[in-house]
Amino acid sequence: MPLGDPSREGAEKLPATIRALGWTSFLTDLSSEAIYPLLPNFVKGLGGSAIDVGLLDGIANAVAAVVRLFAGGLSDRIGRRPLVIAGYGLSAVVRPAMGLVATPPAAVVVRAIDRFGKGIRSAPRDALVTDLVEPEVRGRAFGHIRALDHAGAALGPLVAMLFLLAFPGTERTLFLFTIVPGLVTLAVIGRFVRDPPRQAAAGGPTLATLTGAQWSLLGCVAVWALGAASELFLLRRAEDLGVAQPLVPLVWFGISGVKSVVAAWAGPLVDRLAPRRALVAGWLGFAAAYAGLAWSPSLPGAIACMLGVAAAYGVAEPAERALVAALSPAGRHGAAFGWYTLVQGLMALPAGLLAGWLWERGPD
């Protein structure tokens, strides 16, 4: 179960496919996040700058964004499972190649292909969750998956830290080993994930299919995403305030652990309060935590604000997905999640570049 999950019984009442998707997310993030916290220093060692760090995430997410849109619409026609398998499979095979790169551009390419895989699977997976559960428990279902996702993200950096403490300077070997949980992920999907019976939709994800409420939500998501710069900058801030590089994964463990705990509790809360209210609360908390981080000169204060950012994410993520599902017409859930993830991904590039530019030129 996710870290701090308050309702094991509630999770056990979820369909087996959703429980399997939760553990799939856990395994994927276990491998992905063992790498992620090490990337800023790794790119720096390859001769990269803070702008390269912004490009690493910005380009990767932007490339995946368009794929998410078409993958979501395609899943409305051919089913969710084939695209979920393809997306997880691509990432599992490509991610270990980070251990072979020699230049910052090569690192960007590997990261982009990894995120390309995420783009293929993200919208179909969330649409599959929507297909499988009733509206009154969508918050719980998305909270369960996000909690396990972040539990994997918490343990991945911890495994990386212990590995590097035992074998200093072997980051590339660690990257290569991430193929193991990736292959286990594919085995779980192949055994447990199934599409429910449903009628295939006609046509693709066109702008004409969006309702006024969906347009409003996408506009709000775009504004929020522009201010939500890559969390790699949180790790770089921790390093600047004195956290030793081998201990940086421990910071990421704390951030992801808080996300896991809060998402597990927030899922049922979203169902009770309504997704819109929970989403506003999460976004306001996010803004307040980032404002505190900007003004905190000490490491303890900065860490507290980073954990505040994590808590806000834990509330906002299941609320966003539950609201997207609630606003999407029947048979168009894949396209709806495709548009949602498209907006998130497209805003990642300007958000990353803006954060990198401010980092390079702003006050110390």
Q: Locations of the language-model features?
A:
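A membrane-interface helix-boundary motif in multi-pass transporters
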Residues: 164-180, 357-364
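Helix-loop junctions at membrane interfaces in 12-TM secondary transporters
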Residues: 99-110, 294-305
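Helix-loop boundary and gating motifs at the non-cytosolic
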Residues: 11-61, 214-251
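Helix-to-loop junctions at the C-terminal end of transmembrane segments
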Residues: 67-79, 164, 262-275, 359
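Structural signature of the two symmetry-related core transmembrane helices
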Residues: 82-97, 179, 277-292
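C-terminal membrane-cytosol helix-exit motif in multi-pass small-molecule transporters
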Residues: 180-199
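Cytoplasmic helix-loop-helix junction between adjacent transmembrane helices
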Residues: 110-151, 323
